[in-house]
Regions:
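Formylglycine-dependent sulfatase
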Residues: 1-172
Length: 172
């Protein structure tokens, strides 16, 4: 779980995140992580590959992710994990299944907040509703289907990217 916007305990004292706090307490936390390029796609490419941008080839939001890249999903897959990439990809306008993953459900480019077309394993699939709810549902389904064996899911949310358009339930 990469959860950078809310912070855990204390960054925004009024924001209660008990589940994130529990994950942080029971998992691994990187409290001082830095990026070499402060854009979402280059940062995502570094996270996926563990390589600086001048080595992984993604230097801006328009550059497609090199399909032959070795990702953490590639390595986990080789170790027997079933892997998935779900949600915001946005490295160029790249279509198709995500490199190193057994399963992908993501959208092209910035996508849309509502009724965003999702590509499931490269197949365009209409969706209904707020995009982060839709991608969360894909992630939950994947985890339920694979709960009896090792799996790894990377889920990228759109909501942290402008222009901001929260779901109806959060507008009041």
């Amino acid at each position: 779980v990469v959860q950078r916007e809310q912070g855990e305990r204390g960054r925004f004292p009024w924001l209660r995140t008990p589940h994130m706090d529990r994950l942080a307490a029971e998992g691994v936390r990187f409290r001082n992580a830095y990026v070499t390029l402060p854009l979402c796609a280059p940062s995502r490419a570094v996270f996926l590959t563990g390589r600086y941008n001048h080595l992984n080839g993604v230097a801006n939001n328009r550059t497609p992710f090199p399909a032959d890249s070795v990702t953490h999903s590639t390595l986990l897959r080789a170790a027997g994990y079933t892997t998935a990439y779900i949600g915001k990809w946005h490295m160029g306008n790249q279509s198709g299944k995500r490199p190193g993953c057994d399963y992908s459900a993501s959208f092209i480019g910035q996508g849309r907040y509502v009724d965003c077309p999702i590509e499931v394993n490269g197949v365009p699939t209409p969706s209904k509703g707020w995009v982060d709810d839709v991608t969360t549902d894909y992630a939950i389904r994947f985890m339920r289907e694979h709960r009896d064996r090792p799996f790894a899911v990377m889920l990228g949310y759109k909501a942290t990217h402008g222009p901001f358009d929260p779901p109806e339930r959060a507008r009041e």
